[in-house]
């Protein structure tokens, strides 16, 4: 395996869960610890120009081994795991030659069931890596990191012709800041691929337009016994805002190209409340309409409030759909498709119901579609990855590098 699984297990041992609403990058110390470890590993593996920025971005170059000119390409994965579920003390389980049925996650009652996750029916006979039911796994995106570095090692060991290959590992992707301090000029690639996708064959070149919304509500608290005409309950206003949004446009009611409003947190009291939403839409027109609706709903709910009570809405764009940017460079997609077919994998073109660092980088002049990792059920205790899928990802990365050199000859 050329240490593919060993690498993965090592990386998931680092607690790199990122945090939202933190001003500095990386948002957690664990990410920088993993970044330093990767920096050292890349140096030991023979990478050149290995660097680690103050913001936790690791970069390095695997030098080419051919005499002719080949475009420099890149591969990128992220260091952090989702804030949605703990990534501390990850204890991976190996299920060899999966035979079907429920997989016990650790000692308790948690199971990974094909009833809830039918994709397991396609995993028969494969080696699966699961959690112990207490944490997420971290295949998103430490499988990607392990796959990229393993592919680079195998290119060297097998003396496969390739040009310069840039590799980068970024912080805080899960909170939308992964590419904020990414130095595109220093990376110096013609195009790149994030290795941050899901099931085998996935190739993604379009993603959500995304924004985060903060709704701050200031009410007025008095004794409930004498509250008539005086009390303004901030929590009641919050529920009215949520009820005014379409109930059939939430994450749990949408799929494919449908967008949504997602209330991710609500905290508060009678006096004050704060709501956090994320807005998602594949089309820019729909995206802007969702933002306008948030302001309109807040204005309507807040109509007639006393002077000292108010509703304040702040919206910050996170990233945009990279579809048009990548479409200007069709060879980038065609190359990945051919590489997959050369590895006996049929490409599955699908939209990302989320975002990647590649979305932001594509808008900054680095076309960057997304490749699969072989992982499933991200951001939760039911996350798992197929070892065979990871091996296929390694093969595709290697084939992309080789094809790039072949076509430049």
From Swiss-Prot:
Cofactor remark from the record: Binds 2 Zn(2+) ions per subunit.
Sites where the protein binds Zn(2+) 1: 78, 140, 196
One Pfam short name: Peptidase_M20
A GO biological process held by the record: peptide catabolic process
Catalytic activity of the protein: Release of the N-terminal residue from a tripeptide
Annotated catalytic residues: 80, 173 (proton acceptor)
Cofactor: Zn(2+)
EC number: 3.4.11.4
UniProt subcellular location: Cytoplasm
Residues involved in Zn(2+) 2 binding: 140, 174, 379
First and last residue of the signal peptide: none
Gene Ontology terms, MF aspect: metallopeptidase activity; tripeptide aminopeptidase activity; zinc ion binding
Coiled-coil spans in chain: none
Entry keywords, A to Z: Aminopeptidase, Cytoplasm, Hydrolase, Metal-binding, Metalloprotease, Protease, Zinc
Major localisation: cytoplasm
Classification via CDD domains: M20_peptT
GO cellular component, one term: cytosol
InterPro entries: ArgE/DapE_CS (IPR001261), Bact_exopeptidase_dim_dom (IPR036264), Peptidase_M20 (IPR002933), Peptidase_M20_dimer (IPR011650), Peptidase_M20B (IPR010161)
Similarity comment text for this entry: Belongs to the peptidase M20B family.
Function according to Swiss-Prot or TrEMBL: Cleaves the N-terminal amino acid of tripeptides.
Annotated protein name in UniProt: Peptidase T
Lineage: Bacteria, Pseudomonadati, Pseudomonadota, Gammaproteobacteria, Enterobacterales
